[in-house]
Amino acid sequence: MSGNIYMDIIASQVSQGNFGGKNGQFGYLAKDKSRREKKLTKETKFEAPKKKVEEKFECNVFIGSGTAKSTDSNGLSDPFVIIWSVDAEGQPDKSLFKSKVCKKTLTPNWDEKGTLKLKESYKSLIVELWDHDLLTANDFIGRARINVDAINIKKYSYTFKDTISVYDGEISTPSGTVYIEITNSSSTKSFSSCA
């Protein structure tokens, strides 16, 4: 827009082919309008900031045997394991792995393998032990945290092996244990456990 309504009307009519079109006596108005619009477009062009590409890598996980406190009326539990990622703010991000349910036992043996897809921003992993219930909500048994330490191991494979004690809030007495192995052969992270 030039600010002069009459000039804008004439320029608009010239663009539509009236008054001899762009080659007619008022053709320069359409060309000026076109230049002004291009200039405005260049000046107001918005470029979104480029996102940093976050490194991602995979680790193999093995969930072995463990223990679980009794949560069912029959004196047993139906335990299963969930592994969660933890974001940069320390909050659970998403479920990375869920084991099968071992029915009616206090000494489960999952003997299960899987893959964890990790991101560079993950600071730790949470291992949770749950009791599966069919008719009611699952019962929480306990949780533990595995820290993801920034150690350069690009040239070496690394395996974290530990029987992790999980706690339901009372730090003094574990409510269960989970044997876990995390094998990392191609990334830049190693793992250590903490309660």
UniProtKB/Swiss-Prot annotation:
Top-level taxon of origin: Eukaryota
Cofactor(s) listed: Ca(2+)
Domain C2: 38-161
Species classification: Eukaryota, Amoebozoa, Evosea, Eumycetozoa, Dictyostelia
Binding residues for Ca(2+) 2: D72, D131, D133, D139
Name of the featured protein: C2 domain-containing protein DDB_G0290753
Gene Ontology MF terms in the entry: metal ion binding
InterPro entries: C2_dom, C2_domain_sf
Pfam families noted in UniProt: C2
Keyword field: Calcium, Metal-binding
Gene3D superfamilies in alphabetical order: C2 domain (2.60.40.150)
